[in-house]
């Protein structure tokens, strides 16, 4: 007897990925940072795609953003591609923003795989599994064409590639993705003050302390009115602020 499907909550982000390949090494880290940013995320953690495929499609339709994480083994899963088809349909209707993410796979390889007439489209790490999957489903030409259309469409979008030389660690890669998701959801990417604002606040507090508090409670109040005091405290405040800015939301790369 089929279990009853409850109406899902509205998700902000749906993550489409090859579970047993990426869950532990990348996706868990990405999910953590999204949730730390206050973003509601849906991930199919049970890895029983066949049981509730329609349910997953519903979750996609309830979402505002979908992250399509392409990896070397992505095309070993027909369920990943079926989800991608639904994501593409929602994207064409302007009901969903899809962001392609290329994790340890070349973006041009993924794009070539989606073009059945393209030269050299069958020799890549992504292309070969896709070729095999299409052969296994040769009796379902409409389904295969849907996969190819979805791949062509989604990979034309501006996304993120782990192979970009700017990313030394997964942490930097993840933080850029989270920043883009927040931008698409109209969530302020930085709630901190600017350096000018912090400096102004530090000067204001400094003046209040030096001319109103120190004279009442400290014997050597003249020191707190010297340039050394003002410059020193301002430098400490700004250094602390910059340290915080560089380290906020950073977690160590997953092992």
From Swiss-Prot:
At the top level of its lineage, which domain of life is listed?
Eukaryota
> Which residue numbers delimit the TIR domain?
9-185
- Name the EC number(s): 3.2.2.6
Grouped into one coarse class, the protein's main location is: nucleus
Which terms does the record give in the GO molecular function aspect? NAD+ nucleosidase activity, cyclic ADP-ribose generating
Q: Name one Pfam family in it.
A: TIR
KASH domain location is 201-255
| Record's subcellular location | Nucleus membrane
Give the residues annotated as active site.
83
* GO annotations of cellular component type: endoplasmic reticulum; nuclear envelope; nuclear membrane
Consequences of knocking out this gene: Shorter roots.
Protein's UniProt keywords contain Iron: no
Q: Which reaction does it catalyse?
A: NAD(+) + H2O = ADP-D-ribose + nicotinamide + H(+)
* Keywords, comma-separated and alphabetical: Hydrolase, Membrane, NAD, Nucleus, Transmembrane, Transmembrane helix
**Keyword Nucleus, does the record have it?**
yes
Topology term for the membrane: Multi-pass membrane protein
Question: One GO BP annotation here?
Answer: signal transduction
Gene3D superfamilies recorded? Toll/interleukin-1 receptor homology (TIR) domain
Top-rank EC class of the record's enzyme: hydrolase
> Where do the TM regions start and end?
195-215, 223-243
The record's annotation in InterPro entries points to:
TIR_dom (IPR000157), Toll_tir_struct_dom_sf (IPR035897)
Q: How does it assemble?
A: Forms homomers. Interacts with SUN1, SUN2, SUN3, SUN4 and SUN5.
Q: What does this protein do?
A: Could play a role in nuclear morphology, specifically nuclear size.
Q: What is this protein called?
A: TIR domain-containing protein
């Amino acid at each position: 007897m089929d279990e009853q499907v409850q109406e899902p909550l509205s998700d902000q982000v749906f993550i489409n990925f090859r579970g047993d390949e990426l869950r532990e090494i990348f996706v868990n880290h990405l999910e953590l940072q999204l949730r730390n940013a206050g973003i509601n995320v849906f991930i199919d953690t049970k890895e029983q795609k066949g049981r509730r495929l329609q349910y997953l499609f519903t979750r996609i339709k309830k979402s505002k953003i979908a992250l399509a994480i392409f990896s070397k083994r992505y095309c070993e899963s027909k369920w990943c591609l079926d989800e991608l088809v639904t994501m593409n349909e929602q994207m064409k209707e302007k009901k969903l923003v899809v962001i392609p993410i290329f994790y340890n796979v070349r973006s041009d390889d993924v794009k070539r795989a989606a073009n059945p007439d393209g030269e050299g489209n069958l020799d890549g790490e992504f292309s070969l599994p896709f070729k095999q999957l299409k052969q296994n489903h040769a009796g379902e030409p409409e389904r295969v064409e849907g996969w190819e259309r979805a791949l062509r469409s989604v990979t034309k979008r501006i996304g993120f590639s782990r192979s970009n030389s700017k990313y030394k660690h997964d942490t930097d890669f993840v933080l850029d993705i989270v920043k883009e998701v927040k931008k698409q959801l109209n969530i302020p990417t930085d709630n901190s003050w600017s350096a000018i604002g912090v400096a102004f606040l530090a000067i204001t507090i400094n003046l209040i302390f030096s001319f109103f508090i120190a004279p009442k409670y400290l014997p050597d109040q003249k020191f707190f009115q010297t340039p050394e005091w003002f410059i020193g405290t301002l430098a400490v405040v700004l250094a602390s602020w910059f340290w915080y800015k560089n380290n906020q939301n950073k977690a160590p790369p997953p092992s």
